[in-house]
């Protein structure tokens, strides 16, 4: 995310559907209060991977917020959740397994949909359950 020098800011998505990026930016503006209308936005998914699963929505939005604010995300943070048009955070399949696997890989903090909160605590990991995009932004 960077200030645009052009009349129409660019939206470039590599590894993510262009329409998904446009929808996520609209939700971020409406329910996150971030004005990115005059910003160029570039999203590049590492390793040539194509993100088709909506569970990456929240992580993508938080990475864009991180870039816009020039505040890096915590390296020990894992994030997942589908973002709806009304700013709600929807659960994703296999949430418990995702958290356990993230903990095995050294992640110490997670921001996830409330419905994906673990039934039992995960050793060494603080899990934050959210239901709205605005709540996720408060935890950055």
Predicted feature locations:
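Peripheral, non-AAA+ core regions of ATP-driven protein-machinery
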Residues: 1-140
